[in-house]
Each structure stands twice: as structure tokens, then as C-alpha cells.
Amino acid sequence: PTLLPMFLKNFIKKYPKVKLIIEELNTDEIIQRLNNGHLDAAIAATPLHENKIKEIVLYFEPFVAYVPEHHQHYNKQEIEISDLDINEILLLQDGHCFRENVLNFCKNDAKSERTHFQLESGSFETLIKLANEGLGTTLLPYLHTLDLNENDKLKLRHFKEPKPAREVSLIFPKSELKI
């Protein structure tokens, strides 16, 4: 949803005869549809480690922490990966590649398991709203932060080096190149 506005209008103007069907799917659905021939190509966080899928890296997108005002790290200008407690981070639900990226770079610093509740959402908007209610912090892909309102942008904290980022690639079946 954050990438489309950057190119879709120009693409449609330049290639008016191309039939373009755009769907927002989680990573598991993308892999399944690519493998069964119901999807020609997709853009997803990689690497996927899928033998039947070809990946062409498009860019690397940094993670940005969303830290609400009441949180202990709110007054920091930049944060470090070691500042994160995986048990305080509100995550996307299973099947989303961004969730897996967050879990991968936080796994070494996981403290104790969250005992009072566990939340997994399907949207970044829900995660932001819940963070604002004091239920934790969340991490966002950089492109998603560009559309936040000015008040929410004040709650963004960039990471010190090494900055966590995700690899984003064009993916398609190796067996048949349709693009």
C-alpha cells in the first residue's frame, strides 16, 4: 500500500494496454499463489528461501520505531536494537513478512514472555493506535511513516548504526517468467 502511489499512475499512463490486477496479500498467500500459477509476480520482503521462486532485489527499507510519549525511550533521539524488548513490541499477525523481519532482529534480546496480553494485528494503523493507548511500541517500514500525521511523526525514532532494514524484492516463479 505504501509503494503503489509512488509509481502506479505513471505506470498506467505509460502502459495503458497492460492488464494490472493488484492485491494486498500476506507472504504465505503470495508464495502459495506464485507456486500454483495464480499470480505472475509480487513485491515482498525477502529472502524467502523458496526454491521455486526467483527474487530480484529492488531496495532496502529501514525500520523505524514508533515510540509513544509515555514510553521510556520517547526522549531518545535515536534508539538501538538493544533498547527493544520484543515483549513490548506490537506485531503484525503471522504470515506477514514484516513480522518475521522484526522477530529475526529482536530474537537475541528477547527478555521474558509477555504475560498480561498478546496482540497481533493485520494493519500498521491498528498497531499505531494501540501504541498510542499505552499498550507497547511498534516498528514500521520507513515508507509507511511518510503518510503519518505530524503528531505521530513526532513519535518516530530512527535507529543508530547498524540500522535494521528489510530487503524488498520483485518475486516470481522460476519455472515461467511471465513478466
Model-flagged regions — what are they?
Residues 1-15, 19-24, 28-32, 100-101, ...:
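N-terminal winged-helix
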Residues 3, 155-179:
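A late-sequence structural motif
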Residues 28, 46-53, 100, 104, ...:
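A ligand-binding cleft/hinge motif common to bilobed small-molecule-binding domains
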Residues 18-26, 45-46, 113-123:
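Short beta-strand-to-loop elements that line the ligand-binding cleft
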Residues 52-89, 174:
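Flexible hinge/capping segments at coil-to-helix
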Residues 6-10, 21, 27-63, 67, ...:
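Short beta-strand-centered segments that line the small-molecule binding cleft or hinge
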Residues 88-110, 179:
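Secondary-structure junction motif
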Residues 46-47, 69, 95, 141-144, ...:
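Short secondary-structure boundary segments
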